[in-house]
Amino acid sequence: SQKITKRIAIFDIENGLNQLENFPYHDYPLNQVRGAHHNVISFMSDQHPVRNYSEAKDFIKRTDLVKDVFTGQLDWLRKQAAMGIYAPEFVYDHIINQLNELINYSADEHPLYTEFFKKVELLNISESKFSSLDNNLRASIETSVTPGFVLLRDYMVSTKAKANKNHGIWSQPNGDEFYKLRIRSYTTTNFSPEEIHNIGLSEVARISARMMEILTSLGYDSTKTAGVLMNELNEDPSLLYADTLN
């Protein structure tokens, strides 16, 4: 098992190095499911420990750096833009909406504030220390966190006209080669995109045919497709549990 683990590790590292060396700016560091704007909130809210007063102060020291973090992210995005790489239009729409939501939070509503004080309220600290944390985090959100999100939002708005009209990575500079690398990473094969596509079509046809054999043998309508029949099965009351508490 150690030999297999080693081979997997080497495979992953080689693919990662290939991407870093040949496609360093083909990723989308801001998108609708992940990115710096998500990571800051999730790390600070869910992972950063606040088990004592010292850690609470450390939390605020880090929120003071959010604007710097996003400034660094902007430098990366500008280098990506210099290569002619922009995220697809639908990504822009989601990101701008998400950033506007984060910008429009008041301090009392901000997830960094609310999650932080859920933890602080469990600490045995004096009222003066509690008040100090409250004032400092409010100031940090106002001077670092929100301005950082504004930086990202303004960049996305200013470059939206250049957003990629296509969704596929193939449409980016040297995108076909990057796509081949991602296929290799995901499938662990050296198949071409065309071969992978044809395998997919073949497997869908094979599985659908076998499903139809089973469904028609059970008396289901053979004139309908496997997909239609599966949807009907999912909605058949006789095959569903009742909506009860038990």
Q: Where are the model-predicted features located?
A:
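N-terminal maturation segment of proteins
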Residues: 1-246
